[in-house]
């Protein structure tokens, strides 16, 4: 890439091949133009990632114009594609690893019509390290190495077969590992055979890295729906709503959630801490000089009050659970709430999918912890066990803020590009996509938004977003916004994905890694190497230490290179 503040040029290489390995055509710049047009015309699920980034694209997607030539993506020649952006985006290059920006050959697209991109190997063209050989639903996926791939020397595994696993037989993975069918097997600490597996592989059970997913508890500050509730009177509803609007009350809950106990319900006690996360933006997501993002957030957080002193925001440990702090904050909140006529106990409805046993156990763990810390004469957690459809409809798939039928919910967010804004902007008070989880509408609830300070949060985001030349200053400003979010406790960070146990013959840290895009996901096998014997803890830990050191240097180098080529 030759990047600048409002545009970038990308040079092309490689050729298209069919599933049989036959050459189809060269990859050309026009294929990238066709790719965006195809995604736009077919309402691609990730369109929001680029819709307001590329000049003219939003007008095309929303129907203001049907002339795609007005969109800021052009083929300058056969091998150079140019993107014109609507605004400066220092993180633009990291967006290009998302499939929404991948190329599509127009001739092939027309030949396949509605069959394009279906689940048959011949429905797409290939120019990556592998060709899809077979896809059998709920059975297996098979890949073979693409011999024509430009970087084929770095692809050491000739064939890949993925077996379908629905989680019902947790002993199956280790059986297939021992028989040689699997190169990697998940190990489940809560399964019936874990003790036996641990005894046999005590030196070989290793834990995956935490990923980019951030899970958290969040409050609904403007609840309108009460179809699933334990509350029996309007007074109880009003008391809960007033309590949730009180920052001391929210902070009390934040300090009272035992995240380790919650995680243990699905990950087991031994692995419970390995998936914990204390920030919305992963603490090592970006570097600010010689400090991690999380370290800078910590320095900002203490400015909000002494209760935040000594808080460790690193991953894989609970930075918040503190019974004494929780009770002190609750005492402050109770005085303030009683002066407003609030009656106790405060009833908090928390929905959960009743078919997800781990989730039910987790919510019951939260109930037990909070009622123990505060006493059930002060707070009662009412776990609402709902059908899968009902749970989706009151939470993740709720059509509007007013349909969110809960007081407290467990939700999550995944970053799309290498900038803190990907985690923080969705909650801005003007047009944030996920403002709705608080039960808020940007236009209808301005007064409530201001009373919560979300207008201040939005101002912090704007100030950070306006800094496009000095990356360190930009990230530091976003750290201020993250600190505000922690102090406000509308969102209470809890855990990530990853941190899971396995036995494996995959040589540690030989596969690609990225917190954004598809290049670092679990289905990228370029660079990966296998070894004869299972990986040991010692081997894994030594490789991890070396990788972390090299990763930090690579991030610093990348940020310096960005600063040097801004036009």
Question: What function would you assign to each model-found segment?
Answer:
Residues 25-108:
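Surface-exposed binding/hinge segments that line
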Residues 68, 78-79, 84-161, 172, ...:
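Gly/Pro-rich hinge or "lid" segments in bacterial periplasmic/extracellular proteins
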Residues 252-299, 354, 358-368, 398-567:
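Detector for C-terminal structural segments
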Residues 1-7, 12:
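Single conserved hydrophobic/aromatic residue that forms the stacking wall/gate
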Residues 176, 308-415, 551-554, 558-565:
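Ligand/substrate-recognition segments at binding pockets and active sites
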Residues 18-22, 90-103, 218, 227-232, ...:
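A structural "hinge/loop" feature
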Residues 133-148, 163-232, 260, 264-269:
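Extracellular/periplasmic solute-recognition and catalytic clefts
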Residues 8-9, 32, 81, 128-130, ...:
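Short, well-ordered beta-strand elements
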């Amino acid at each position: 890439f030759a990047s600048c503040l409002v545009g970038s040029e990308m040079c092309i290489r490689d050729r298209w091949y069919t599933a049989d390995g036959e050459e189809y055509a060269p990859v050309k710049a026009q294929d990238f133009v066709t790719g965006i047009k195809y995604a736009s015309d077919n309402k691609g699920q990730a369109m929001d990632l680029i819709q307001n980034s590329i000049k003219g694209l939003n007008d095309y997607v929303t129907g203001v114009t049907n002339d795609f030539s007005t969109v800021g993506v052009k083929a300058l020649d056969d091998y150079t594609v140019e993107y014109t952006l609507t605004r400066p985006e220092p993180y633009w290059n990291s967006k290009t690893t998302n499939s929404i920006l991948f190329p599509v050959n127009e001739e092939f697209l027309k030949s396949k019509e509605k069959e394009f991109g279906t689940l048959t190997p011949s429905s797409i063209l290939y120019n990556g390290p592998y060709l899809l050989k077979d896809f059998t639903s709920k059975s297996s996926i098979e890949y073979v190495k693409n011999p024509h791939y430009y970087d084929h020397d770095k692809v050491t595994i000739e064939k890949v077969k993925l077996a379908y696993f629905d989680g019902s037989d947790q002993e199956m993975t280790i059986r297939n590992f021992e028989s040689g069918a699997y190169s990697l097997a998940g190990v489940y600490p809560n399964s019936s055979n874990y003790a036996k597996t641990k005894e046999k592989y005590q030196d070989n059970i290793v834990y995956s890295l935490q990923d980019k997913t951030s899970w958290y508890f969040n409050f609904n500050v403007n609840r309108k729906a009460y179809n699933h509730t334990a509350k029996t009177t309007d007074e109880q509803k009003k008391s809960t709503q007033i309590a949730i609007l009180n920052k001391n009350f929210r902070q009390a809950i934040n300090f009272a959630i035992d995240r380790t106990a919650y995680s243990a319900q699905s990950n087991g006690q031994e692995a419970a801490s390995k998936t914990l996360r204390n920030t919305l933006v992963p603490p090592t997501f970006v570097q600010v000089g010689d400090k991690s993002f999380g370290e800078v957030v910590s320095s900002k957080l203490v400015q909000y009050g002494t209760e935040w002193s000594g808080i460790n925001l690193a991953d894989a440990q609970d930075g918040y659970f503190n019974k004494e702090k929780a009770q002190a904050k609750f005492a402050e909140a109770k005085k303030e709430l009683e002066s407003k006529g609030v009656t106790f106990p405060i009833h908090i409805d928390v929905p959960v999918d009743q078919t997800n046993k781990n989730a039910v156990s987790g919510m019951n763990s939260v109930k037990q912890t909070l009622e123990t810390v505060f006493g059930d004469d002060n707070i009662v957690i009412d776990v609402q066990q709902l059908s899968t459809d009902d749970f989706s409809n009151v939470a993740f798939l709720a059509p509007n803020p007013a349909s969110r039928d809960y007081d407290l919910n467990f939700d999550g967010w995944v970053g799309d590009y290498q900038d803190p804004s990907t985690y923080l902007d969705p909650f801005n008070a003007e047009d944030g996509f996920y403002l709705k989880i608080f039960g808020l509408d940007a236009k209808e609830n301005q007064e409530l938004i201001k009373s919560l300070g979300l207008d201040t949060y939005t101002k912090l985001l704007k100030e950070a977003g306006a800094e496009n030349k000095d990356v360190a200053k930009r990230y530091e400003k976003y750290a201020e916004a993250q600190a505000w979010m922690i102090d406000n406790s509308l969102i209470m960070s809890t855990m990530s994905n990853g941190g899971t146990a396995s036995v494996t013959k995959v040589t540690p840290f030989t596969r690609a890694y990225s917190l954004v895009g598809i290049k670092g996901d679990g289905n990228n096998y370029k660079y990966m190497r296998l070894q004869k014997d299972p990986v040991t803890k010692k081997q894994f830990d030594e490789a991890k230490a070396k990788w972390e050191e090299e990763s930090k240097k690579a991030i610093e180098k990348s940020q310096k290179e960005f600063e040097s080529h801004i036009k």
